[in-house]
Amino acid sequence: MSKEDSIEVTGTVLEKFPSGLFSVQLEHERVVLAHLAGRLRRNRIRVLAGDKVTLELSPYDLTKGRITFRHR
């Protein structure tokens, strides 16, 4: 799947799970599970509850995503 196939949305982190997953509420009130992208993990970007983030969702499964950017 190429980058053009993914859906990019923004949301707010609700909670962090011990396994590295995050519960994120999207702008349109949907809650999805997301994990950090490798670039964020490699640069040790901290994501906490309440942070605004940008997600990539697969068009095949809209319940799981990847956090690609943390807004300030």
Swiss-Prot record:
List localization entries. Answer: Cytoplasm
Q: Name one GO cellular component term.
A: cytosol
**Per the database entry, which stretches of residues form a coiled coil?**
none
Task: Please provide the record's keywords in A-Z order.
Answer: Cytoplasm, Initiation factor, Protein biosynthesis, RNA-binding, rRNA-binding
List the Gene Ontology MF annotations in alphabetical order: ribosome binding; rRNA binding; translation initiation factor activity
Ranges for domain S1-like: 1-72
Function of the molecule: One of the essential components for the initiation of protein synthesis. Stabilizes the binding of IF-2 and IF-3 on the 30S subunit to which N-formylmethionyl-tRNA(fMet) subsequently binds. Helps modulate mRNA selection, yielding the 30S pre-initiation complex (PIC). Upon addition of the 50S ribosomal subunit IF-1, IF-2 and IF-3 are released leaving the mature 70S translation initiation complex.
Q: How does it assemble?
A: Component of the 30S ribosomal translation pre-initiation complex which assembles on the 30S ribosome in the order IF-2 and IF-3, IF-1 and N-formylmethionyl-tRNA(fMet); mRNA recruitment can occur at any time during PIC assembly.
Q: Which family does it belong to?
A: Belongs to the IF-1 family.
Record's NCBIfam families? infA
Q: Which PANTHER family match?
A: TRANSLATION INITIATION FACTOR IF-1, CHLOROPLASTIC
Q: What is the recorded name of this protein?
A: Translation initiation factor IF-1
Gene that this polypeptide is encoded by: infA
